[in-house]
């Protein structure tokens, strides 16, 4: 993509001002830099040739590179934004442009473009709309998903109450049985609401990369110990193999949640009376953690949908084992927030392997 295409005003050279005017305007850049650095939003100043002459720290963070001194098209590859900046640099009226980027995670922005005068350049201020759009989507999703998934346990609770108040009114043994079933349904609703809230929080902050330092080997060992009781219940051996430590950039609490969801799934659905292998290794500039079970495996047609909200390979089995259908969706969004990658490999009869790959701590 050429600069001429992205910046139409290059086709007609900008008239040169007399030397005296150029000298008089020289102090403009330092003044612009002060103004831009004082702005709370990401901001950049672009000269008449499309080169970024000043940018604040927020702009460098969003663009994941220092844009000053580079052509704007190397940092923002959105034709509508570049055309608006080109027009403003020619002295035309400013404009606002909404746009999205998809890599490394989806984000939405509104670019406010203002002219600094004919031939002098333009000021570009970016407003991150990602969070407010996500909040709006999550409100709608939460209501739709919660109402759908809560309908079954609520109907069961209502039925049990009718029985206790009717046919079992004087039957203490039946009342005890139905109260136990009601407790089970209430626990199911609590788990569902907890997972929905957890997923909503993660999605809300997915565009913000965590900055902590986490030992992935320590996280795996901790989760193995926490779930040792569950492993005994399923008569399953959990084997951990890895180096002394693997440091990654991330949130410890979220990575514990990832590890716990993966190991719980392996124990519940894959390895009753068998074994689960947790393997950690360094792969060039990344850390890889895999959880492998030796259970029945998953048919190929299900694999692309496993991380969808509420998608279950076997609905009845999942619900009977206390699953909410949100565990792998939570894993996917946490891994995305950490700029990592989730890989699922499975074949019927040969078990399943869930692997995450995260950047090493630099």
Short names for language-model regions:
Residues 339-340:
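Conserved glycine-rich
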Residues 216, 297-305:
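Short helix N-cap motif at coil->helix boundaries in the Bergerat
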Residues 71-131:
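PAS-family sensory/regulatory modules and their coupling/dimerization elements
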Residues 212, 232, 237-246:
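Conserved catalytic submotifs in the C-terminal HATPase_c
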Residues 18-59:
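Sensory modules in modular signal-transduction proteins
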Residues 184-189:
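Short alpha-helical segment of the dimerization/phosphotransfer core of two-component systems
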């Amino acid at each position: 993509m050429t600069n001429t295409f992205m910046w139409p005003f290059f086709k007609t050279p900008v008239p040169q001002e007399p030397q005296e005017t150029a000298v008089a305007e020289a102090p403009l850049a330092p003044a612009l830099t002060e103004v831009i650095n004082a702005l709370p939003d990401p901001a950049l100043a672009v000269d008449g040739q499309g080169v970024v002459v000043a940018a604040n720290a927020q702009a460098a963070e969003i663009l994941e590179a220092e844009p000053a001194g580079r052509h704007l098209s190397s940092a923002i590859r959105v034709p509508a934004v570049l055309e608006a900046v080109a027009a403003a640099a020619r002295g035309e009226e400013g404009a606002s442009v909404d746009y999205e980027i998809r890599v490394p995670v989806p984000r939405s922005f509104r670019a406010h473009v203002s002219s600094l005068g004919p031939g002098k350049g333009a000021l570009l201020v970016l407003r991150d709309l990602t969070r407010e759009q996500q909040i709006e989507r999550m409100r709608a999703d939460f209501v739709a998903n919660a109402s759908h998934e809560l309908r079954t346990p609520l109907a069961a609770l209502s039925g049990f109450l009718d029985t206790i108040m009717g046919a079992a009114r004087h039957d203490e043994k039946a009342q005890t049985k139905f109260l136990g079933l009601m407790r089970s349904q209430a626990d199911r609703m609590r788990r569902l609401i907890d997972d929905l809230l957890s997923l909503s929080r993660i999605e809300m902050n997915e565009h913000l990369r965590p900055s902590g330092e986490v030992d992935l080997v320590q996280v795996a060992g901790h989760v193995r110990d926490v779930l040792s009781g569950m492993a005994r219940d399923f008569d399953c051996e959990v084997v951990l193999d890895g180096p002394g430590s693997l440091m990654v950039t991330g949130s410890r609490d979220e990575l514990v949640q990832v590890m716990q969801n993966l190991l719980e799934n392996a124990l519940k659905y894959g390895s009753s009376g068998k074994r689960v292998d947790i393997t950690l290794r360094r792969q060039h500039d990344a850390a890889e953690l895999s959880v492998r079970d030796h259970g029945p495996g998953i048919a190929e047609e299900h694999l692309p949908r496993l991380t969808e909200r509420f998608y279950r390979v076997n609905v009845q089995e999942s619900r009977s084992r206390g699953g909410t259908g949100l565990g792998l969706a939570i894993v996917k969004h946490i891994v995305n927030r950490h700029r990592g990658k989730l890989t699922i490999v499975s074949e019927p009869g040969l078990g399943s392997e869930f692997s995450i790959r995260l950047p090493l701590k630099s």
